[in-house]
């Protein structure tokens, strides 16, 4: 594993459960934050203005809206989202290869329209909340999660996407198949002994990086800590070892 010169570049802070004022306060406490993730909660409550605010503060944005619809709708959504200045935009690989290819082209066109660098589209594979049992019982899918993730990552890659989102449990075998330029973004990161909340397939930050994760999505472990700045530094220290 290579030495990590700037570990803060490896951490994407999930701004879930926060409003705009909370976000501003967090960024004041931790000015070293480079990447932030804006998900459904924050985007729906605050709208695109929160993205403009984050860009003004020099933050890189992962717009995690997980688009999943018919191909035309997904493509149009990505066309619009690519004009926000977000570096990463997520969509579900289960939307299918046609939707992913159309979305990728639409994102390039949308960014070009406003003279921005096109974002990398990230394919959501299997959410970290799924367990093997619920996967089989609820969806009637007999494949293992690993098999399914491998297949969906292949769809993402073959569709021209810039990477995918997967749990720490799948990072290692995916990295064996894809170069470092293919982003493997990993949520489900916890510090040892912390509450895993509603996620099931989780791991320690240092281990996820060693296994090949490009970046780690970390939310509540930092944002809900009594000392957010200390926790952020702690995670940076862990992954720089």
UniProtKB/Swiss-Prot annotation:
GO molecular function, one term: orotidine-5'-phosphate decarboxylase activity
GO term, biological process aspect, one: 'de novo' pyrimidine nucleobase biosynthetic process
SUPFAM superfamilies, per the entry: Ribulose-phoshate binding barrel
The protein's Enzyme Commission number: 4.1.1.23
CDD domains attached to this UniProt entry: OMP_decarboxylase_like
Pathway noted in the entry: Pyrimidine metabolism; UMP biosynthesis via de novo pathway; UMP from orotate: step 2/2
GO cellular component, one term: cytosol
This protein's record includes keyword Lyase: yes
Keyword vocabulary terms for this entry: Decarboxylase, Lyase, Pyrimidine biosynthesis
InterPro entries, sorted: Aldolase_TIM (IPR013785), OMPdecase (IPR014732), OMPdecase_AS (IPR018089), OMPdecase_bac (IPR047596), OMPdeCOase_dom (IPR001754), RibuloseP-bd_barrel (IPR011060)
Sites where the protein binds substrate: 16, 37, 64-73, 128, 190, 199, 219-220
Transmembrane segment boundaries: none
Top enzyme class: lyase
Source organism, top-level taxon: Bacteria
Cystine connections: none
Reaction catalysis annotation: orotidine 5'-phosphate + H(+) = UMP + CO2
Active site: 66 (proton donor)
Subunit-structure text: Homodimer.
Record family assignment: Belongs to the OMP decarboxylase family. Type 1 subfamily.
Function comment: Catalyzes the decarboxylation of orotidine 5'-monophosphate (OMP) to uridine 5'-monophosphate (UMP).
Annotated HAMAP family: OMPdecase_type1_B
Name of this protein: Orotidine 5'-phosphate decarboxylase
Organism: Prochlorococcus marinus (strain NATL2A)
Lineage, uppermost ranks: Bacteria, Bacillati, Cyanobacteriota, Cyanophyceae, Synechococcales
Record gene name: pyrF
């Amino acid at each position: 594993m290579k030495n990590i010169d700037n570990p803060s570049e490896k951490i994407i802070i999930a701004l879930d459960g926060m409003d705009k004022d909370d976000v501003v306060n967090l960024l004041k406490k931790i000015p070293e934050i480079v990447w932030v993730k804006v998900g459904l909660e924050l985007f729906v409550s605050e709208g695109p203005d929160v993205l403009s605010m984050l860009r003004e503060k020099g933050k890189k944005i992962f717009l995690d809206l997980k688009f999943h619809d018919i191909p035309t709708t997904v493509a149009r959504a990505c066309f619009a989202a690519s004009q926000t200045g977000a570096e990463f935009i997520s969509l579900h690989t289960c939307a299918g290869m046609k939707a992913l290819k159309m979305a990728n082209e639409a994102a390039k066109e949308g960014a070009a329209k406003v003279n921005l660098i096109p974002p990398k589209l990230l394919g959501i594979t299997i959410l970290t909340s799924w367990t093997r049992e619920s996967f089989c019982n609820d969806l009637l899918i007999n494949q293992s999660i690993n098999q399914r993730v491998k297949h969906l990552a292949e769809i993402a890659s073959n569709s021209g996407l810039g990477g995918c989102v997967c749990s720490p449990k799948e990072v290692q075998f995916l990295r064996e198949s894809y170069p470092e330029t293919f982003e493997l973004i990993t949520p489900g990161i916890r510090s040892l002994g912390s509450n895993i909340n509603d996620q099931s397939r989780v791991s320690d930050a240092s281990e996820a990086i060693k296994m090949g994760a490009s970046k780690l999505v970390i939310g509540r472990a930092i944002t809900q800590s009594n000392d957010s700045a200390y926790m952020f530094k702690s995670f940076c220290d862990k992954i720089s070892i």
